UniProtKB/Swiss-Prot annotation:
It is found in: Cytoplasm, Nucleoid. GO terms for molecular function: DNA binding. Binds to DNA and alters its conformation. May be involved in regulation of gene expression, nucleoid organization and DNA protection. The keyword Cytoplasm applies. Signal peptide: none annotated. Belongs to the YbaB/EbfC family. This is Nucleoid-associated protein MYPU_0500. It comes from Mycoplasmopsis pulmonis (strain UAB CTIP).
Length: 100
């Protein structure tokens, strides 16, 4: 290989890295909203919980266990959606193969 080919490959690798970083930044800004029977949970692509909204009807002290279960279900579903979004980004990366 000559220097021209190596330089071109390095440029392609840098371009690919920039594209991945841009997609990650877009994902981090994206919000994922999950609703479960009066409970709304909002997370961002960094897996940070941004908001929890609980319908007043769910706040009855006798319903504490139900509320906790709903929170758990909503949170886990949100995490699955975020993981799916991360996998979509990974699919766009040539399976660990750089152009050299």
């Amino acid at each position: 290989m000559n220097n021209m080919n190596i330089n071109e490959m390095l440029k392609q690798a840098k371009k690919m890295q920039s594209e991945i970083e841009l997609k990650e930044k877009e994902l981090y800004k994206k919000e994922f909203t999950i609703e479960k029977q009066g409970l709304t949970l909002v997370l961002n692509g960094k897996r940070e919980v941004l908001k929890i909204d609980i319908n007043e009807a769910l706040v009855d002290p006798e319903d504490k266990d139900i509320l906790e279960d709903l929170l758990l279900l909503a949170f886990n579903e949100a995490m699955e959606k975020i993981d799916e979004a991360h996998k979509e980004i990974e699919k766009q990366i040539p399976s660990g193969k750089l152009p050299f």
